UniProtKB/Swiss-Prot annotation:
This basic c-type monoheme cytochrome has been found exclusively in the green photosynthetic bacteria, although its role in bacterial photosynthesis is not established. It has an unusually low redox potential compared with mitochondrial cytochrome c. It is reactive with cytochrome c oxidases but not with reductases. The keyword Transferase does not apply. This is Cytochrome c-555. GO terms for biological process: photosynthesis. Signal peptide: none annotated. GO terms for molecular function: electron transfer activity; heme binding; iron ion binding. Heme c binds at residues 14, 17-18, 60. InterPro entries: Cyt_c-like_dom (IPR009056), Cyt_c-like_dom_sf (IPR036909), Cyt_CIE (IPR002323). Binds 1 heme c group covalently per subunit.
Length: 86
């Protein structure tokens, strides 16, 4: 995954929820909120982000609600967010 390339996707498609914690999304940079997700591993996080995920605090629509994103773009955005949240 290319975290640097993922920043643009994050800014365009992910920040709306992950910058503010909207709908229960873990805020980028909040190590405690991200820790349980990071513990599952990148492959699980990316798969959940691509297909959608219902967690205990909310739900994430498939591809963050942007079906135009490629799986690679989603993976890169996840890598960017994880890198900012470790």
């Amino acid at each position: 995954y290319d975290a640097a390339a993922g920043k643009a996707t994050y800014d365009a498609s992910c920040a709306m929820c992950h910058k503010t914690g909207m709908m229960g999304a873990p805020k980028v940079g909040d190590k405690a909120a991200w820790a349980p997700h990071i513990a599952k591993g990148m492959n699980v996080m990316v798969a959940n982000s691509i297909k959608g995920y219902k967690g205990t605090k909310g739900m994430m629509p498939a591809k963050g609600g942007n079906p135009k994103l490629t799986d690679a773009q989603v993976g890169n955005a996840v890598a960017y967010m994880v890198g900012q949240s470790k």
